[in-house]
Each structure stands twice: as C-alpha cells, then as structure tokens.
Amino acid sequence: MSLFGLLLLTSALAGQRQGTQAESNLSSKFQFSSNKEQNGVQDPQHERIITVSTNGSIHSPRFPHTYPRNTVLVWRLVAVEENVWIQLTFDERFGLEDPEDDICKYDFVEVEEPSDGTILGRWCGSGTVPGKQISKGNQIRIRFVSDEYFPSEPGFCIHYNIVMPQFTEAVSPSVLPPSALPLDLLNNAITAFSTLEDLIRYLEPERWQLDLEDLYRPTWQLLGKAFVFGRKSRVVDLNLLTEEVRLYSCTPRNFSVSIREELKRTDTIFWPGCLLVKRCGGNCACCLHNCNECQCVPSKVTKKYHEVLQLRPKTGVRGLHKSLTDVALEHHEECDCVCRGSTGG
C-alpha cells in the first residue's frame, strides 16, 4: 500500500472516532437534560424522596406548559422532624385532562397517605383547584400519571410546608366532617339524599369519584350472595329503590322497613336506610272463619338478599369504611286470614 493511501485511511478512521465521540456526548447531554427536567422518577415502582425542612414545591414536567405524555412520576415528602405534618397547597394554575363520567381515569394527580395507603384525593380537569391536603404524619406521597393521549396545560404545581399539629385550626362542632358525627346523627343526615352520587360526594368531597369507582369495581373475593346465587342482578341502581305501595286485602304488599331495625344493628349505617319488602297487610273483613275477629298473617315466608351501601366507623382512626353488602330480609309470599289468637287457623 502506498504511503498516500495509508495516510488517507488513517485520517478517515480518526474522523469516524471523533464523530462517534461527538454523537455520544450529544446523546449524553440530551439524556441528562431529560432526566433533569422530569422533576421526579419515571419508574412507577420507585419514588423520589424529598426531605422537607422548609417550604418548597413540586410540579408536573414543563409546568406551566403542556406536560409530556406517557409519564408516571412519584414523590414522597418526608419531614425532618417526626412530630409534624406536611400541608399541600395547589397552585391556582391547575389543568389536566378532563375526567370521563366524573372519574379521573387518564391524566391525574393523586395524594396518598403512606402510613396506611389511603388515597386522600385524585384530581384532573380544570374546573376547580383542589383544596389543601394535610398528612396524618410526617410523610405524604404524590403521584402524577399521564397517558398517551390529550396532554393539557398548565399541569399542576403543589406547594408544601411544615404544619405543627398543636397550631392547626380546630374544627368547629357545627362543621364537623360527616365521618366525625355520631352514627345516629349521620344516619339522619344521609336520609336526605336521593342519589348515591350525592351521598358519596357529601361523605368524601375531595375523593368521591374514587370511592364511587371503587364501589362498582368487580372484586371476586367480595362478591355477595345476591351475585353468587343469582337472586338479583349484580348491577343495581341504588337510586331507584322506591316504588308505589299498592293496597290489597290480606295479600303480600309493599312495606318500607328500616334495615337497622330489622337487623338490630346500631353500629352500622345502611343506605338506602329503608327498603321495600313484601309483608302481609290489609284487612280480613270477609273472613270465612267463624270467629269474632280475623287477622292477616303470613303462611309462606322467604328470605331475599338486597345489595346496599354499608358505612362502618374505622377502628382507631377517623373515617368510615364504605362497601356494598347483601342484607337478608324476610318477605311474605302468601297470606291467610285466621282467627285472632288462633294457632290452628
């Protein structure tokens, strides 16, 4: 090979190495810029831990501009001192993808209590700015999720600060949250609601969409007797459990009964609080028995299951357990007129 050819080959190889190195440096630069911009972690199995000693803030990527798609970011705020709380305040500039059927399914930010996994709230859309959130201890977790469609702006920004428990505002007895009311008062309060949506919104103003979604999420471990035995459809419109009462003479007719009284449960609230059951009613004016007075009594009784919302106080902490449950109530299938006080009819 000539000396001239060898020089050309050496020059070409050197240029290729320089180009590769420049490309690698450029790639690393973009990667570093991208990682710095995320303001959190991309892997949903990990979280970015932020030590909180002074005021600060976290925000969606590119805030207040359109956030990126396909993003999952998790932050866990941990106060330096143990006996303090963390307060979150949302910036007035708030806008994520709109909910579907009033439920935040796609793009949302949610706040979780790390101690017990309770979701304090999930928010999306741009109609209202979420209210302040206060942790139960010295930690709180925030998660931001966006899917591959319709990113919005400006995203969100959450300001955090330390709150001393002894200096938090006391809740006035007149504005106690529903979960803090005695069961009897709460039972009276919820009877005024005609739809399940309004009831859940009253109980959990910040996270009612989540609770409503959880109630109707299929869970095989919790399927009730009404589902397994096919006594009624699993999908029940709890807003339409009222009907006209028709009067018959000693026949099964609709009666409204209090579930708490029927089951003798004073530790639990049910909604609806009353249900229609078949009970013998009417009169026996045309009684065929030769007696002074007849009465209408059941001759065939069965038990039927009704799916209702059950509210029970949580043990040791403030709040209510909410679940759909089946209650068994007596229904009179057939009725007869018998002499009052008679055992044989």
UniProtKB/Swiss-Prot annotation:
Changing residue 124 to S: Loss of mitogenic activity of CUB domain in coronary artery smooth muscle cells. Induction: Up-regulated by EWS-FLI1 chimeric transcription factor in tumor derived cells. Up-regulated in podocytes and interstitial cells after injury/activation of these cells. FGF2 activates PDGFC transcription via EGR1. Up-regulated by TGFB1 in concert with FGF2. Proteolytic removal of the N-terminal CUB domain releasing the core domain is necessary for unmasking the receptor-binding epitopes of the core domain. Cleavage after basic residues in the hinge region (region connecting the CUB and growth factor domains) gives rise to the receptor-binding form. Cleaved by PLAT and PLG. Residues 1-22 form the signal peptide. SUPFAM superfamilies: Cystine-knot cytokines, Spermadhesin, CUB domain. Changing residue 234 to A: Not essential for cleavage by PLAT. This is Platelet-derived growth factor C. It comes from Homo sapiens. The gene is PDGFC.
